[in-house]
C-alpha cells in the first residue's frame, strides 16, 4: 500500500511523476478542475457579496471517488497541480473536497518535471497560497459577470449563441479597428528608381536607389518626374561618400509564453492553440530512449525572462564546449522583464541542456521536435555573445541625382550561429556590398522605375495580436490562446491564411459593445483591471472589494443597455454555391458546430450543406478527394467526396505521405505520448511510433 498520495491535473503528468517517486507514492490525476461555477446559471450570489456557488463538475464523480478512496488509505496527501493561479485554485478545491486543512504543508510545486526537481519539491511542501486562489476566484467571477450579463443582451438583440468577454471583446475590437483603418486608407502613388551598377569581376550588379537631388531627400510621386530623373542621371555614377560603422546585435531573451507563441507562429506556422498543446506535452513528460519518461521543458505559462543560475551555468558550459569561448559573454546575459510582468516562474527553457534536439528527435513526433528545437536554440542563443556587424552606406552622384546603397557584413556571428529571430514582415537582410572608395566611377547597366502605392497597415496575425495584447497589458499568458480560439469559434473573426479578419458579425457586436459597454472594450480600462487583479495575487487588495468596485457602475450600464439597444438584423453572407433544390445561391449560417451552407428560402426550402474542406489526400478506395466532414453531433470525421457511392470514412485525419512499408493511406492519431502517423491498410501495422522503436533498437 502506498504511504503518500500525490494529486496532479493530468494523467500524462501523473505517469511521469509516478516513475520518479517510487513505490511509496501513489500519483493520481484529477483531470483538470473538479469544481467550478455552474454553466446553467450565473453562479455568483450578487446579493451576498459576490459569493461563488461552486458545484462539482459533471463527469468527475468516478475520478473523485477514486481520489477519495486513495486519500483515505494514504498517510500523507500532496497537491502537486501546476505552479500558477489555476493550479493553486485546483489544489484549493481538492483540499475542500478531501476536507484537508489548506494551511497545512500539503502543496508542492515544481517548475520542471524532472526527477531531481520533483523529489526536491516533496521535501519542501507549503500551505496553499490563498492570495493566488483569491486572484483566480476574482478573475473567474469577473469573467462570469461580464459574460453572463452581457451575452443574453446580445442573444436578444443580435442572435443566440453569441458571447462577450473581458478579454475577447477587446481583442475583437482591436481587430475590427484595424480593418476599419484598412478600409479607410487612401493609397498614395510613389515611384522607386533603382540603378543597377556593373561591378568589376562580378555577375551580380550593385543596386543603388534614388534618394534625392544634390544630397537632399526627394520623394517621387508621378511617372513624369521619374522619367526626368532617369534621363538626367545618365549612366555614370560617381561615389560621393562612403560611411562604414560597426554595430552589435544583442541576443534575444529566452521565451515567455507570449514570445514562444509569436515565434512558433512566425517560424513554424503553428496556431497559438497548437503551440500550447505541444508545449504542454513537452512539459508534462515524453518517453525518451535511454532516459525514461521526463519533462523536456520548464513550465509553459510565464511572463518572466529570468533564468535559474544552474541552468545558465549549464548553458554557458555547453556554448563553450560546442562553439568555443569566443561565444561565451564576459558577463552572463541578464534580461529585464517587461513592465507589469509577474516573474513568478522562470522563462521557458530546456529542463536538461544535455538533451539536444537531435538526441531527442527519435523520441518525438514532428511537431514536438520542431517546438523543442525552437525552445532549445532560443535558450542557448539567449546566453551567447552578441553578433558583430559592419554596415556600409555608399552615396553616388549621377549628374546631381543622389543614389544610395547600403549593405551589412557579419564580422562575428555570435548568437546567430544557432538562432535567428522570425519576422512578421518579408523584409530581407541587406547583403554585403563590394569595397568602394570616394570618386570611384560605376557604369549603370540600366536604371529602372517602378510604380508603387503606399500600403495600409497590415491585418493582425495571431503572433502580432498576442504581441499587442501583451504590450497593452491585456490578459495573461494563459489567456491568449483560448481568447483567439473563442473569437474564431463565435464567428467574430475568421482566419484568412495567417491573417485575422473580422466578420460582419464581429463589426456589429463590436459596435454594440462600444456604444453601450465602452469600458469593457477600452484597452486602458481592461489593462487597469488586470493590474488590480495582480494586486490581489500579491495580497495587496481584497478580491471582493475589486469586484464590488467594478459591479456598481457595470450594473447601471446593463440596465440602460437592455432598454436602448435596438434589434439588429445581419444579412447572411452569400456563397457561390447554388441550391440544387430551388436554384437560389446558398448563404453562410453559423450553427452550434460552426459555419454551414443553407438555402435562403427557408422554410420553403430546407436544404443545408456542410462547408467542404479538402485535405488534398486521395481516397484509397476510389481515388476521389477525401474531405473534412462533421457528424450530427459536431464531431469531425473524414470521408470521400463521392459518398454515398464510396463508403470510405475515418475519424483520424489522413496525411499526404504514403506508408513507406506498403504504400497505403496513413492517418494521424493521438496517443499518450503525443501524435503519430499510422497506416490503415489491413495487415500492414506500420506506425511512425513503431519506426522510432525500430530505430532505437538498431541503435542499441
Describe these PLM feature segments.
Residues 16-20, 66, 89-97, 117-121, ...:
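Alpha-helical scaffold elements adjacent to nucleotide-binding pockets in ATP/GTP-utilizing enzyme cores
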Residues 1-140, 211-212, 220-224, 423, ...:
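Intrinsically disordered, low-complexity regulatory segments
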Residues 259-272, 466-476:
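Short helix-coil junctions and helix-kink-helix linkers
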Residues 139-149, 167, 197, 247-259, ...:
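Core structural elements
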Residues 111-116, 257-258, 278-285, 291-301, ...:
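Short, conserved phosphate-binding/catalytic loop or strand-edge motifs used
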Residues 217-253:
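Metal- or metallocofactor-binding catalytic centers and their adjacent structured scaffolds
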Residues 113-195, 245:
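C-terminal or mid-to-C-terminal helical accessory/interaction module adjacent to the motor/catalytic core
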Residues 2-5, 16, 25, 151, ...:
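Basic, low-complexity terminal or inter-domain segments flanking catalytic cores
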Amino acid at each position: 500500500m502506498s504511504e503518500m498520495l500525490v494529486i496532479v491535473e493530468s494523467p500524462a503528468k501523473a505517469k511521469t511523476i509516478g516513475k520518479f517517486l517510487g513505490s511509496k507514492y501513489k500519483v493520481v490525476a484529477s483531470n483538470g478542475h473538479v469544481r467550478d461555477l455552474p454553466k446553467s446559471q450565473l453562479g455568483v450570489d450578487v446579493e451576498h457579496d459576490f459569493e461563488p456557488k461552486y458545484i462539482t463538475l459533471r463527469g468527475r464523480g468516478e475520478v473523485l471517488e477514486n481520489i477519495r478512496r486513495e486519500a483515505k488509505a494514504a498517510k500523507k496527501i500532496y497537491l502537486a497541480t501546476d505552479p500558477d493561479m489555476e493550479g493553486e485554485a485546483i489544489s484549493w478545491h481538492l483540499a475542500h473536497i478531501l476536507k484537508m486543512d489548506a494551511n497545512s504543508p500539503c502543496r508542492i510545486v515544481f517548475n520542471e518535471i524532472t526527477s531531481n526537481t520533483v523529489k526536491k519539491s516533496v521535501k519542501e511542501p507549503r500551505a496553499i497560497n490563498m492570495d493566488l486562489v483569491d486572484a483566480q476566484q476574482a478573475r473567474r467571477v469577473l469573467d462570469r459577470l461580464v459574460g453572463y450579463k452581457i451575452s443574453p443582451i446580445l442573444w436578444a438583440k443580435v442572435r443566440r449563441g453569441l458571447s462577450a468577454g473581458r478579454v475577447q471583446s477587446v481583442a475583437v475590437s482591436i481587430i475590427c479597428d484595424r480593418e476599419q483603418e484598412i478600409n479607410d486608407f487612401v493609397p498614395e502613388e510613389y515611384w522607386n528608381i533603382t540603378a543597377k551598377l556593373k561591378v568589376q569581376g562580378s555577375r551580380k550588379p550593385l543596386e543603388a536607389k534614388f534618394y534625392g537631388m544634390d544630397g537632399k531627400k526627394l520623394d517621387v510621386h508621378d511617372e513624369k518626374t521619374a522619367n526626368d530623373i532617369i534621363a538626367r542621371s545618365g549612366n555614370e555614377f560617381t561615389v560621393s561618400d562612403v560611411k562604414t560603422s560597426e554595430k552589435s546585435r544583442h541576443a534575444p531573451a529566452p521565451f515567455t509564453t507570449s514570445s514562444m507563441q509569436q515565434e512558433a507562429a512566425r517560424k513554424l506556422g503553428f496556431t497559438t492553440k497548437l503551440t500550447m498543446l505541444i508545449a504542454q506535452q513537452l512539459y508534462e513528460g515524453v518517453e525518451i530512449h535511454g532516459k525514461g519518461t521526463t519533462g523536456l521543458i520548464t513550465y509553459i505559462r510565464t511572463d518572466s525572462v529570468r533564468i535559474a543560475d544552474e541552468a545558465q551555468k549549464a548553458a554557458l558550459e555547453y556554448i563553450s564546449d560546442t562553439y568555443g569561448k569566443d561565444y561565451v559573454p564576459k558577463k552572463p546575459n541578464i534580461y529585464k522583464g517587461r513592465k507589469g510582468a509577474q516573474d513568478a516562474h522562470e522563462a521557458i527553457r530546456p529542463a536538461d541542456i544535455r538533451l539536444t534536439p537531435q538526441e531527442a528527435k527519435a523520441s518525438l513526433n514532428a511537431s514536438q521536435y520542431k517546438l523543442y528545437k525552437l525552445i532549445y536554440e532560443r535558450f542557448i542563443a539567449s546566453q551567447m555573445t552578441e553578433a558583430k556587424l559592419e554596415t556600409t552606406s555608399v552615396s553616388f552622384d549621377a549628374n546631381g541625382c543622389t543614389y544610395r546603397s547600403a549593405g551589412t557584413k557579419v564580422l562575428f556571428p555570435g548568437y546567430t550561429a544557432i538562432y535567428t529571430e522570425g519576422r512578421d514582415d518579408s523584409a530581407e537582410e541587406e547583403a554585403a556590398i563590394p569595397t568602394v572608395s570616394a570618386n570611384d566611377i560605376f557604369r549603370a547597366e540600366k536604371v529602372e522605375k517602378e510604380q508603387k502605392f503606399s500600403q495600409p497597415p497590415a491585418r493582425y496575425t495571431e503572433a502580432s495580436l498576442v504581441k499587442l495584447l501583451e504590450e497593452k497589458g491585456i490578459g495573461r499568458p494563459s489567456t491568449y490562446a483560448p481568447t483567439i480560439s473563442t473569437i474564431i469559434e463565435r464567428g467574430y473573426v475568421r482566419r484568412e491564411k495567417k491573417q485575422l479578419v473580422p466578420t460582419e458579425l464581429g463589426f456589429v457586436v463590436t459596435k454594440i459593445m462600444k456604444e453601450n459597454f465602452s469600458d469593457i472594450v477600452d484597452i486602458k480600462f481592461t489593462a487597469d483591471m488586470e493590474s488590480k487583479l495582480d494586486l490581489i495575487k500579491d495580497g495587496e487588495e481584497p478580491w471582493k472589494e475589486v469586484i464590488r468596485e467594478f459591479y456598481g457602475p457595470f450594473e447601471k450600464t446593463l440596465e440602460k443597455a437592455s432598454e436602448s439597444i435596438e434589434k439588429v438584423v445581419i444579412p447572411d453572407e452569400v456563397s457561390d454555391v447554388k441550391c440544387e433544390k430551388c436554384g437560389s445561391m446558398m448563404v453562410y449560417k453559423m450553427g452550434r458546430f460552426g459555419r454551414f451552407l443553407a438555402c435562403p428560402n427557408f422554410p420553403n426550402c430546407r436544404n443545408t450543406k456542410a462547408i467542404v474542406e479538402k485535405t488534398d489526400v486521395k481516397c484509397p478506395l476510389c481515388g476521389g478527394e477525401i474531405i473534412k466532414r462533421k457528424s450530427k453531433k459536431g464531431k469531425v470525421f473524414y470521408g470521400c467526396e463521392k459518398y454515398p457511392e464510396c463508403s470510405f470514412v475515418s475519424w483520424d485525419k489522413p496525411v499526404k505521405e504514403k506508408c513507406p512499408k506498403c504504400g497505403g493511406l496513413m492517418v494521424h492519431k493521438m496517443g499518450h505520448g503525443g501524435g503519430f502517423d499510422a497506416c490503415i491498410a489491413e495487415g500492414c501495422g506500420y506506425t511512425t511510433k513503431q519506426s522510432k522503436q525500430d530505430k532505437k533498437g538498431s541503435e542499441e
